[in-house]
């Protein structure tokens, strides 16, 4: 699997585990503990997938921080695929995340095979989005040439 992934989680152990597990599966893996740096990183490089934790403040487990950053990420161009990850998953939070634009929702501790399948599906979706955008650009140029 090619592509670039940004993993955002306040837990260094989670970041290390994901980095180790995914290092041969992506061409670039960036890990980040502080979500305040997400938009800066997305402005510097084009990531295909963002794997985003839902909670960053100790003792807070309602997912509002993850939803906040999800909405911010989805306003960036080009828009990466966002998969949320949390230890405090519930159905209502997952539904809200999906309605807000997340592609998938993973609960910690994750199953490596399932996580990999989720990331592969996300990468295929991202590749499809890129191809659609290329076709739209070509179509626009053709229409401009005709007119």
Feature annotation, model-predicted:
Residues 108:
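A Lys-centered signature of the CheY-like receiver
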Residues 45-51, 55-56:
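Active-site beta3 strand of CheY-like receiver
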Residues 59-78, 96:
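Short amphipathic alpha-helix used as the core "switch/output" element in two-component signaling
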Residues 12-30:
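Two-component/phosphorelay signaling modules centered on CheY-like receiver
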Residues 114-147:
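Flexible nucleotide-interacting loop at or near the entrance of a catalytic core
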Residues 26-35, 41, 61-63:
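Short hydrophobic/Thr-rich beta-strand motif most characteristic of the beta2 strand and flanking loop
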